[in-house]
A protein has these predicted regions:
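Short, small/acidic-rich helices and loops at N termini and domain boundaries
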Residues: 1-13
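Intrinsically disordered, low-complexity regions of eukaryotic proteins
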Residues: 8, 81-83, 196-197
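Conserved inter-motif catalytic segment of the P-loop NTP-binding fold
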Residues: 12-13, 26-30, 34-35, 40, ...
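OB-fold nucleic-acid-binding modules
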Residues: 18-23
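Phosphate-binding/switch region of NTP-binding enzymes
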Residues: 46-47, 52, 56-57, 61, ...
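Walker A/P-loop NTP-binding motif
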Residues: 61-70
């Protein structure tokens, strides 16, 4: 860039603090699988299912596995969906005995600014953040894309600061024998994540 217009454009870009793509960085970048063909480190992931499908239970076991196998250094689990009684019924004390498993009941009004504040943490490497469930942390209408884009921008910045983030989400109510695998809310929920998984409770009969 060598003329005045180019210099102005460069100044605008620099003031926006955008990061220029670096060829060497791209060539040296390797994907690190936390679980082969399922979970990549430093990604934003949605896991959604109907009520009673075992989303939270699944995340407790997954979290414990990742810590026990030294895939990550710590887990920060934010729960605004379940009660302490529910956690006890799920034998939560056995999961929480795992070192560096931090579990927080997040049921006050401060939860609505969690994502905005979380992005300020600059070093979240080797950290798994679990959001259970995301609808409980959103004060705005989560059916509207223009309100959800801001929420996901905040989550993406936390991911870019090193975190692996998994949030749990719900489905609309459906007939028991029918499931179209739809999730609640705006298309942003799937558009703005690295991966989205539908969790189905296997029939053991």
């Amino acid at each position: 860039m060598n003329n005045k217009n180019d210099e102005l454009l460069l100044e605008i870009i620099q003031n926006k603090q955008f990061k220029q793509a670096n060829i060497k960085e791209l060539e040296n970048l390797e994907f690190e699988w936390l679980i082969d063909d399922f979970l990549v480190k430093q990604t934003l992931v949605m896991i959604y299912a109907g009520a009673g499908s075992g989303k939270s239970y699944f995340m407790l076991y997954l979290s414990k596995y990742l810590l026990d196998s030294n895939k990550i250094n710590r887990i920060i689990y934010f729960d605004a969906d379940n009660s302490i009684k529910t956690l006890k019924e799920r034998k939560g004390n056995e999961f929480l005995k795992t070192p560096n498993f931090y579990y927080y009941f997040s049921n006050n009004i401060q939860k609505f600014t969690l994502f905005k504040d979380m992005q300020k943490a600059k070093d979240l490497n080797n950290t798994l953040i679990v959001i259970d469930s995301i609808r409980n942390f959103i004060q705005d209408d989560f059916n509207k894309d223009f309100t959800m884009i801001k929420i996901f921008d905040e989550l993406q910045r936390a991911r870019d600061n090193g975190a692996t983030i998994i949030f749990l989400h719900h489905q609309p109510k459906q007939n028991q024998d029918e499931n179209n695998k739809a999730y609640k809310g705006a298309t942003t929920f799937l558009d703005s994540v690295d991966e989205g998984y539908f969790l189905h409770k296997k029939d053991t009969n």
